[in-house]
Amino acid sequence: MSQPRTRIEIWSDIACPWCYIGKRRFFRALDARADREAFEVVFRPFELDPDAPAPGEPLRDRLARRYGARSEAMMRQAGGAAVGEGITTDWERALAARTRDAHRLLALAALEYGATMQRRLAGLLFAAQFELGGDVSSADELTRLAVAAGMDEARVRELLASNEGEAEVEAGIERAAGLGIRSVPTFV
């Protein structure tokens, strides 16, 4: 009889460079374990900037308005850490964008395809956000990324054209608040 899998939940936001870095570090460590199949990893939603625009705007500009002179140092620090994980951040192209629909899509990936699909999609979303200048608030961009991950295009478009998954995302955000999660990434 096989042992039950240990669930690891990662509260994360696609808008967070430290979440991308943390994802890379975590999965490198997990993948190196002989017992990696004993773990089920699920991404949970967290919105660092729920008022971010859709379509997105230049991340550099939004950070400068929010954090002033500190924003450049923040990007340098995150960019330096990212390089160590094989991530090439492009702060000139990166956009600050609403991530609610990306979270709905990640929830759909987990629910209908499983944790492996969710992990694959999260990687593509993070790369689009920080390396490729993608707008993760755009239904077309989200659809393109989901299809590249292996999800059904019609199903993805159906989700994005509706409010489906909204309650689940909100419940995940409320659960994070109930657990006292105030920063991401957080691993539980």
Where are these regions (language model features)?
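C-terminal cap of thioredoxin/glutaredoxin-like
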Residues: 3-39, 43, 106-107, 111-188
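Structural alpha/beta surface segment adjacent to cysteine/selenocysteine redox centers
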Residues: 23-129
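Short secondary-structure boundary segments
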Residues: 1-2, 48
